[in-house]
C-alpha cells in the first residue's frame, strides 16, 4: 500500500515539474525529483515515465527546448483556475507580453481590461495565445508587470 501511495506522489510531482516547461534534459528532471525527496529515481525511470505519459520535447514561450506533457493532458477543466492558462509573462520598455494556452488570450485580456486603469492597465490587445498590455498614466511597465505577476501568482 505504501509503495502505491509513494508512486502516486512521484507521478503527481513528475507531472507538476513538466507543467513548468523548464527542464531540457532527463538529468534535470532526475535532480528536481531528488530535491523533492524521491531518492531512488534515476534517468532510466524518468525516461520510462516520459514515454508512459507521452511527454515530448518542444519549445516553450522562451524558445527553449523543454519536456512537456501533450496538450490533451493540460486542457483546462471547469475547476482549474485561470492562472493555469498563463504560461509566461515578460516585458520590455513599452509593453507587458503574456503568453497563454492556445485560445485563452482573449479571456485573460478581458479579465485584465475589466481591472482597468486603477490597477495600471490602459488596455490590452489579444490574439490566440499572446496578449500585449500597456500601462496607464502614472504606472511604469515594470509596475504593470509586477501587478500582473501578482494577479496570476507567477514567480519573479
Swiss-Prot record:
The keyword Transmembrane does not apply. SUPFAM superfamilies: C-terminal domain of arginine repressor, Winged helix' DNA-binding domain. Keywords: Amino-acid biosynthesis, Arginine biosynthesis, Cytoplasm, DNA-binding, Repressor, Transcription, Transcription regulation. One of its GO terms (molecular function) is DNA-binding transcription factor activity. Its main location: cytoplasm. It is found in: Cytoplasm. GO terms for biological process: L-arginine biosynthetic process; protein complex oligomerization; regulation of arginine biosynthetic process. Pathway: Amino-acid biosynthesis; L-arginine biosynthesis [regulation]. The keyword Transcription regulation applies. GO terms for cellular component: cytoplasm. Gene3D superfamilies: 3.30.1360.40, Winged helix-like DNA-binding domain superfamily/Winged helix DNA-binding domain. Belongs to the ArgR family. Regulates arginine biosynthesis genes. This is Arginine repressor. It comes from Citrobacter koseri (strain ATCC BAA-895 / CDC 4225-83 / SGSC4696). The gene is argR.
